[in-house]
Amino acid sequence: DNSATRAALEMCSAASRPFAVLTKGGMRAADDFDIYEGNGWFGTTLAFTDDRSRQAWEPCAASVESRIEAIRTAHSLGIRTWVSMEPVIEPAQALDLVIELRHDVDEWRVGRWNHDARANSIDWTEFTSRAIRTCLDTGADFMLKEALHRYACPGAITRYVDGQVVARRTA
């Protein structure tokens, strides 16, 4: 039952207040897309292209296909879209999403895999560099989440919006 969520979104919309939604619910969230006009951002978490990986890590979340369909549907309706790319467990899959959804996502928020010793097997410096390069190469707006800043080279872009560098890593 999404009635409480819908009521909250309707209150924001009626008051002309901006809002952003982040969900793992996929197309279940599409029932509320009529409320987003002008004020809302629709977001989902995505870290995998392979639904078998998603099933192993997020068994109760909507499928990768359903989340991608929700992003594409929202974007086609003129709703601003964003993806929280985390936890990054399979770096290659995460970066493939940026390429696949480059025309449908207005902003990427790139994080890392925390709170699990297996995350130490990932070369976060390499991933951070590749994430920045992939976003820039596809023209994607992005923000590196704080957990990745230490892996970026000094001076590296950490936020990029509308073709403009908004923030860089300081030494």
Task: Give short role names for the model-derived ranges.
Residues 122-171:
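C-terminal accessory extensions appended to soluble enzyme cores
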Residues 1-135:
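Conserved AdoMet/S-adenosylmethionine-binding subsite of the radical SAM
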